[in-house]
């Protein structure tokens, strides 16, 4: 018998070489540890809620800022920087207010395949 359908994941994989990724290094250089923390928070919410994207509304902005004890404006600056560097897709963010990206989609498909094969 298969699992009950669920959109998000309880956990997700993280690459061990992520700290060598030039996009992550640029984010950390520009926004220090706060930038990386916000990026990881958003990734967590993406994988937890929908699995491969999140509609980042004012409520999500507030939640993120409140969690990290930051101003919403600063969180938004960091997210916009993440889109500029390609960590999130800039076009989808600007047009729809959705945060996702190529690596997020690839990881999502990989995790779905793992779940599918573990159910077989």
Stretch-by-stretch model annotation:
Residues 1-13, 61-62, 68-120:
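Winged-helix/helix-turn-helix nucleic-acid-interaction surface
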Residues 4-50:
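Short recognition helix of helix-turn-helix/winged-helix DNA-binding domains
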Residues 51-66:
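Short acidic, hydrophobic short linear motifs in intrinsically disordered regions
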Residues 30-35, 57-61, 109-110:
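Short, low-complexity, polar/charged sequence segments that are solvent-exposed and flexible
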